Regions:
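Glycine-rich beta-strand-to-loop/alpha-helix junction loops that act as flexible
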Residues: 9, 63-65, 90-93
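Catalytic core of DAGKc-family lipid kinases
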Residues: 30, 39, 54, 78-193
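Short Gly/Thr/Asp-enriched flexible loops that form oxyanion-binding sites at enzyme active sites
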Residues: 68-82
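ATP/nucleoside-binding phosphotransfer catalytic cores, i.e., glycine-rich phosphate-binding loops
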Residues: 183, 189, 214, 224-283
Length: 283
């Protein structure tokens, strides 16, 4: 079999080269041909997935983090021709929250799954914003979760722990926001602390944000935290994100829906698959 392998050398702790040295012989020993392309700039993986010639290839692989995977999926969805290849993901980032759902956070195990031809369907969430359409495989966040994502981006030197530390900081800086949320046609106008819509169960580094989520059920799991929740209560809820019991708290509302839209009182940035891309309103 022949594969294209896109490698992001900047992912996580910049261990992609080391991981590549470990996994490439695994493919070669099974007689598979791997064409390795190293990304040179942000958005490069997306361009490659959208524009490369796929003739005679059997799979499109990506070695990187959630941001790299997001780029590959969006590039694949943007192709002008109807060609689609199975996408194989090999973790090389610091979060790799999507691969937690597949129990493939170890790059060797992920490579083995690809070599063994293990495939499965995964939902893709189409997200429409002003002058921009993107596709999500992991999460769409607004409010506090976006604040956390922005802060964590500037704390990459802390590794995976940056998500927890950024969360604690932003909880102390907490502010509520007013918005209209429409879930499967039913509108809710109120104050929110944050809204996060998940395709996957995990976000960040192993947080079970949406414990009922399945990657292929055709539903979006939407978690809403009321704007009136206190900082003390938020801090007490934070540890529960790691076992999924936070959804039983009175300030938390959990929906499973086929679609939703969000219109805040003012336009604000959106967190899509861990990347700060686009602004509200969205649907």
């Amino acid at each position: 079999m022949r594969f294209i392998l896109v490698v992001n050398p900047q992912s996580g702790k910049k261990q992609s080269a080391e991981i590549l040295q470990r996994i490439q012989p695994m493919f070669e020993s099974r007689g598979h041909d791997v064409s390795v392309i190293e990304t040179a700039y942000a958005g490069h993986a997306r361009e490659l997935a959208a524009q490369l010639e796929f003739t005679d290839y059997d799979g499109f692989l990506a070695l990187g983090g959630d941001g790299t995977f997001h780029e590959v999926v969006n590039g694949m969805m943007e192709r002008e021709d109807p060609k689609r290849l199975p996408i194989g993901l090999i973790p090389g980032g610091s979060g790799n929250s999507f691969l937690h759902d597949l129990d493939l956070v170890d790059p060797i195990n992920a490579a083995k799954a690809i070599i063994e031809g293990r495939t499965r369907p995964v939902d893709v969430v189409r997200t429409e914003m002003p002058d921009l359409v993107l596709h999500s495989i992991n999460l769409i966040g607004w409010g506090l979760v976006t604040d956390v994502g922005k802060r964590a981006e500037g704390m990459r030197w802390l590794g995976p722990s940056r998500y927890t530390i950024a969360s604690i900081i932003e909880i102390f800086l907490k502010k509520s926001r007013r918005a209209t949320l429409v879930v499967d046609g039913e509108p809710f106008l109120r104050e929110f602390t944050f809204i996060i819509a998940c395709n996957s169960l995990h976000v960040g580094k192993g947080m079970k944000m949406a414990p009922k989520a399945k990657l292929d059920d055709g539903l979006i799991d939407i978690l809403v935290v009321d704007g009136g929740i206190t900082r003390r209560r938020l801090l007490s809820v934070l540890p529960k994100l790691f076992d999924g019991t936070h959804i039983h708290e009175p300030e938390v509302i959990y929906y499973q829906a086929s679609g939703f839209s969000l219109s805040p009182d003012r336009d604000e940035p959106i967190n899509i698959d861990g990347e700060m891309i686009g602004t509200t309103p969205l649907s």
